C-alpha cells in the first residue's frame, strides 16, 4: 500500500509502541506529547526512555508537541491518551479528514459515556471512527512480536483503510462492527485485572484467579448485552483475549497495581510505584455507574470500586464476594 503520514496523539507506552510499529512498516509517524520536555528528550535520545526504554525509534518517527500541526499534516489520526484526557484532545483538534481511530481503553469520567459517544457529539454521528483493541502489551508490539488485534468501526471503507494501515507480518487485525462491545471490554478488563492482582497479592492462588476471570467475563458480557453489544465480541480478542492477558501477566500495570493493594500498600503509594496511569482505577466508578443505570449486577467491579474509595479493605471485599447468596451459573 502507499505509505502515509500518521499522527499518534499520546506518547505513553502504548501510543509509542504502535507509533514504532507504523514507522517500521514505512509510514511517516508523528508522535505527539503535551510535554515539550518529554518531546525534547525523545528527539535527543531517539527513543522514549520515560515510557518505553531501550527501544530505538525508526528515523521516520518524529516527536512533536504541536497538536494542531500534527493533525493537519497527517493522513490518519490515532489517539492514544488516557481516557480522562480523551475529551480534552478531541475538543482541541480540528476535524480529521479521513476519520478518527483510538487505542484508548476506558470511558469518559465526567459523562460516563463511551468514547465513541464523545466523538459523535464532537464530529457527528456519521463521522468514521475505529477502535483498536485486543491482547497486546506495548513492549511486545514495539519489538515486532506476533500480536492479534480487533478493529471495530462504524464505516466499512474507513475500516478497510485502517486495516491496511496496521496489518503486517507481526500484527494480524480482525474486523468488527461492535463498537459498544469492544469499548466495554477494554474498560472493564482493567478493573478485573486489579481484582486478580489483589487476589494474588493476598496469596489466594490459581483457583481464586480463575474464578475472578470467569465471573468477571460474565459481568462484562451482561453489561455489554444490556447496551446492545454482541455476545461473540466478549469471547474474542477484545474480550476474553485481553482479559486473560491483563489479569495474568505482570506486564499489566492494572494487575501490578492490584498486587500492591493486596499486599496492603496504600493506594497513592501503589500508583506512585506503577508510575503510569492505572486505567482500571480511573474507570471503576464510571463502569459501576453505567451498570447501575442499566440495572446490571457487577459484584466484582462493585467491590473493587468500594475498595478504591476506601469503603472496604481487600480481605473484606473478598469476603463480600464469597458470602453472596447462592445462584445458578
UniProtKB/Swiss-Prot annotation:
EC number: 1.1.1.94
Annotated Gene Ontology cellular component terms: cytosol
Active site: 189 (proton acceptor)
Matching InterPro entries: 6-PGluconate_DH-like_C_sf (IPR008927), 6PGD_dom2 (IPR013328), G3P_DH_NAD-dep (IPR006168), G3P_DH_NAD-dep_C (IPR006109), G3P_DH_NAD-dep_N (IPR011128), NAD(P)-bd_dom_sf (IPR036291)
Subcellular localization(s) per the UniProt record: Cytoplasm
Sorted UniProt keywords: Cytoplasm, Lipid biosynthesis, Lipid metabolism, NAD, NADP, Nucleotide-binding, Oxidoreductase, Phospholipid biosynthesis, Phospholipid metabolism
Pfam families per record: NAD_Gly3P_dh_C (PF07479), NAD_Gly3P_dh_N (PF01210)
Amino-acid positions noted as binding sn-glycerol 3-phosphate in the UniProt annotation, renumbered to this chain: 105, 134, 136, 189, 242, 252-254
Function: Catalyzes the reduction of the glycolytic intermediate dihydroxyacetone phosphate (DHAP) to sn-glycerol 3-phosphate (G3P), the key precursor for phospholipid synthesis.
Entry similarity comment: Belongs to the NAD-dependent glycerol-3-phosphate dehydrogenase family.
The protein, known as: Glycerol-3-phosphate dehydrogenase [NAD(P)+]
Organism from which the protein derives: Legionella pneumophila (strain Lens)
